Amino acid sequence: DVAPSRGLGDVYKRQIRILDAELVRNGFHARKSAVGKKYIYQLDLAEKPDVFTRRYTYHFPQRLDLDAMRKAAQLLIGTYEFAGYTDKKDEKSTKRTIYAIMICGQGSKVSIQYEGTGFLYHMVRILTGTLLEVGTGARSIESVKEPLKSKDRSQAGFLAPARGLFLDEVYY
């Protein structure tokens, strides 16, 4: 018998690194059995993109009011119908719980961390685009509640590119 982490590590050694592997109960489903997830969205605000991180961050060379973004993020914490924050129209349920949104900045690097029960199609990227619009002053802090009330995607911000988004942790 080959340890699962070793066998998979041999196949994917250039793309991923396996730190641990565990046996799971019958019926386990990696996505459907999850009780929560944490995503991190990485931004680079420098005038020119960092050559070492440009493939893994969204280059957004604008001044951001991180305090305004944090205030807006607090309005999104809780259990809501997030229909206005998804691009998929036929979701069975759009009710999700966001436990935390943390926005950290150091120099020209900014990271936005999202923790919740789960996220809809494009939800984290739309939330990020909305918070960036708050940060640039293009929208008010209070406006982040409009897509929750109206369930209208057009009331939310732009779809941030996938390039800066990482699934950091899955909770079971």
Question: Which functions belong to the PLM regions below?
Answer:
Residues 1-12:
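Single conserved hydrophobic/aromatic residue that forms the stacking wall/gate
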Residues 4, 29, 52-53, 123:
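Intrinsically disordered, low-complexity sequence elements enriched in Ser/Thr/Gly/Pro
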Residues 6, 26, 61-172:
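Core RNA-modification/binding signature centered on pseudouridine synthases
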Residues 10-43, 47-52:
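Ordered, amphipathic secondary-structure segments that act as subunit-interaction surfaces
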Residues 53-60:
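Acyl-group handling in specialized metabolite and lipid biosynthesis
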